[in-house]
Amino acid sequence: MKRSGALAAMALLIAGVASAQFGRGYNASLSARMARPDSFDGRFHYCRGQYRMNPTGDGGSWLTDYPLADIDLSIRLAELTKMRVGFDAPGQPQHLIVPLTGAELFKCPMIMMQEVGRLFFSEEDVAQLRKYLLKGGFLWVDDFWGSYAWNAWATQIAKVFPPGEYPVIDLPADHPIFHTMFELKAIPQIPGIGYWRGSGGGTSERGADSAQVHARGISDRNGRLMVLMTHNTDVSDSWEREGEDPNYFYRFSVEGYQVAMNVLIYVMTH
């Protein structure tokens, strides 16, 4: 099968698998799963970074989209790839909350953090996160909108990687992360479902200040991407809200899962 045909088939599979389970629902009151030394067994576990809050920032908190984004992405990863994903005996994904200063951080191939416009890194966070990323870890930050949130985040990540040493770049279209499983031309603009409904189908949550999606990154000395920043989009909402509205699902969730599969395959192969 030609690559384009394979990609089209995979897109249909994403839609078909999810449609078969549309609205399946999960218990959002599930107790938080804090990472422990015995939480890791060689399988993939979605790790959500727990960060300190900046009172002068812009956005929600590290709990945004929890736990459904973590659950749904773990399930789709198991369905759409051959990756071994951790599930418990009742069949729930073993997604984990990981404090940035915990030793468990180093057992996570990837850390996901949402709404980082309100994040604050302490000196201890900075030292630990820098060590984790330079040793092969990966950080994906998502769902922060507009120039104020960007500047707040840029100030914090500069503590970890001063831009003169490790510059932030706009990822070029030929970067491998856009081509690992699906051929992506760009990161799509995905709004939170509440904004999308309330605005009558709008996608830019900060108007003209967030009209353009940015896919930015920080790489190590060997060119390995260590930090992915998807700015002016809410990719994780496309996972969390996949069962709420079929129109939102077909418009945004299929693309959101394509982005996620590409990122995760890049992480696990680099």
Language model features: what each stretch is:
Residues 1-9:
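Bacterial N-terminal signal peptides that target proteins for export
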Residues 20-110, 116-117, 234-270:
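Aromatic-Pro/Gly-enriched surface loop or interdomain linker
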Residues 26-28, 41, 54-57, 150-241, ...:
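An acidic, glycine-rich "communication" segment
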Residues 46, 105-151:
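Short alpha-beta junction capping motif
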Residues 68, 72, 76, 124, ...:
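Extracytoplasmic/secreted proteins, especially bacterial periplasmic and envelope-associated proteins
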